[in-house]
Swiss-Prot record:
InterPro entries: Class_I_gatase-like, CobQ/CobB/MinD/ParA_Nub-bd_dom, CobQ_GATase1, CobQ_N, CobQ_synth, GATase_3, P-loop_NTPase. This is Cobyric acid synthase. Belongs to the CobB/CobQ family. CobQ subfamily. One of its GO terms (biological process) is cobalamin biosynthetic process. It comes from Photorhabdus laumondii subsp. laumondii (strain DSM 15139 / CIP 105565 / TT01). Transmembrane segments: none annotated. The gene is cobQ.
């Protein structure tokens, strides 16, 4: 058995996912074969493995940090909320069922053996596994059936580091309270604390660190500053906290409508890092102005979010903006909303609903989920805005339930040449006759650097601006540089040698 280490948090969004990615990068740099693991992830941001299996985006970007191919064993249970009370349960990359919170809480014990087996299968292929918890281990109302925090650490006998976020205030109370609520054996498993997101003079923090170490008996292994490093977010917290407000004006203004059940908003990270793009997430009709491009993102509740668009006034505002010449792109659920009609029987109690009518297309939902990685190219002779994108290569993945049938006034967008490694010929998406409205089922569309730059230059041309002359930003390469910056910062601010000692000493102490 190799080494293992688990990061748990005093709360959600304390930075566990990013720190796990950083540790994976460090261990790989130090010559270890390393993989991430999170037994249960609740998120609407997901991706597809090379085998067509669905898993959380957080474990995908952690695998990227480790320089390895994402493997569904890294995230055996994925919960995707479909409403305020219900979630779709994805087991080992495939949809199993939908449950409410009470049903799932009763169901969890039956998953323990499978999760344990999956972990050991993964661990047998690597030198180090870095586990991530969820929320806080001090959720005492959920402890008896826990499979993701201390319950998981006990299953595989992993030492734990506790991550606390100082930016939100009350960091010492959060550390002390969390440790106080743990059982004695659980507290003994916590080998150190990481204080995250610090701003200011660390000397002012030192007296508090000394006191919390004395009070708890647990050492603080470092204080991570607030970093200007751009990495993917696990869930919608970043949207709620205004990370993507787009305060700085740029040559192009792109707005994404922040649907209540927005899914895979990481689709647009590649746009956010472009030097000439201001990306904004909006929830009010007035915020659509000024826009050079409006994007309708994916949704886990397409009909519910379409109703919300109409009730909120955003549907009318979008149609008005389009009539004034603003192009519109829809991705997955957003693509479906742009059509004439959606026929359901799967997602909600609504049998059918009229779409926004911007594309001559009808969508019919199905029970079977499509989960594929795809490669392809923009089709020849695309009209309007997309004329600059002809034959540009496209890579991405599909996650959807249903299919769309195009009418005479719509043309396909993308020629898919490969699905899950199998060659063939398929068409994806739709474009209207004028080339001002387009949609696709492909997530990660804007990660295709040449396509994205061609599209952005077409938008620049519409505004009378010259084409961007700088280097084309490759988002995949960009992420790799961010992982290296993260690892460098963690080496500077954390006691990495002591973290190694925690893992090795714990393993030695566990050997009979």
């Amino acid at each position: 058995m190799g080494l293992s280490l688990m990061l748990q948090g005093t709360a959600s969004d304390v930075g566990k996912s990013v720190l796990v990615a950083g540790l994976c990068r460090i261990f790989v740099q130090d010559g270890y074969r390393c993989a991430p693991f999170k037994s249960q992830n609740m998120a609407l941001n997901s991706g597809i493995t090379i085998n067509g299996e669905e898993m959380g985006r957080a474990q995908i970007f952690q695998a990227e940090a480790a320089g390895i191919e994402p493997d569904v064993r890294m995230n055996p249970v994925l919960l995707k909320p479909t409403s305020e009370r219900k979630a779709q349960v994805v087991l080992m990359g495939k949809v199993a069922c939908s449950m409410n919170a009470v049903e799932y809480h009763q169901y969890k014990p039956s998953l323990q053996q499978q999760i344990c087996e999956v972990f050991h299968s993964l661990a047998s292929e690597y030198d180090v596994i870095v586990l991530e918890g969820a929320g806080s281990p001090a959720e005492i109302n959920l402890r008896d059936r826990d499979i993701v925090n201390m319950g998981m650490a006990e299953m595989v006998d992993a030492p734990v580091l506790l991550v606390a976020d100082i930016d939100r205030g009350g960091v010492f109370a959060a550390i002390y309270g969390t440790l106080a609520l743990l059982r004695p054996a659980e507290k003994a498993r916590v080998k150190g604390v990481i204080i995250n997101k610090f701003r200011g003079d660390i000397s002012l923090l030192q007296p508090g660190i000394e006191q919390i170490e004395a009070l708890t008996g647990v050492p603080v292994l470092g204080v991570m500053p607030w970093l200007d490093i751009d990495l993917e977010d696990e869930d919608g917290v970043a949207l709620q906290t205004g990370k993507y407000d787009g305060a700085t004006e740029k040559a192009l203004d792109i707005t994404v409508i922040r649907l209540p059940h927005i899914a895979n908003f990481t689709d647009f990270n590649a746009l956010a890092v472009q030097p000439d793009v201001r990306l904004r997430y909006v929830t009010q009709p007035s915020a659509l102005q000024p826009s050079d491009l409006i994007i309708l993102p994916g949704s886990k509740n397409t009909l519910g979010d379409l109703q919300w668009l109409r009730q909120n006034g955003l549907a009318d505002a979008l149609l008005t903006a389009h009539q004034a010449g603003v192009p519109v792109i829809g991705i997955c659920g957003g693509y479906q909303m742009l059509g004439k009609r959606i026929i359901d029987g799967v997602e909600s109690g609504i049998e059918q609903m009229d779409g926004l009518g911007l594309l001559d297309m009808e969508t019919r939902f199905a029970h079977e989920k499509v989960t594929t990685r795809v490669n392809g190219n923009c089709l020849l002779a695309l009209p309007g805005l997309l004329s600059e994108c002809v034959e540009q290569p496209i890579r991405g993945y599909e996650i959807h339930m249903g299919s769309s049938l195009l009418g005479a006034d719509a043309t396909p967008f993308i020629d898919i040449t490969e699905r899950n490694g199998q060659s063939g010929g398929w068409c994806d998406g739709a474009v209207n006759r004028e080339g001002s409205v387009m949609g696709s089922y492909i997530h990660g569309l804007f990660d295709s650097a040449n396509f994205t730059r061609a599209l952005l230059n077409a938008l620049r041309q519409r505004k009378g601006l010259a084409a961007y002359q700088g280097e084309i930003l490759d988002y995949t390469h960009y992420k790799q540089t961010q992982f290296d910056l993260l690892a460098k910062a963690m080496r500077e601010h954390l006691d990495i040698e002591r973290i190694y000692q925690c893992m090795k000493t714990h393993r030695q102490g566990s050997v009979p």
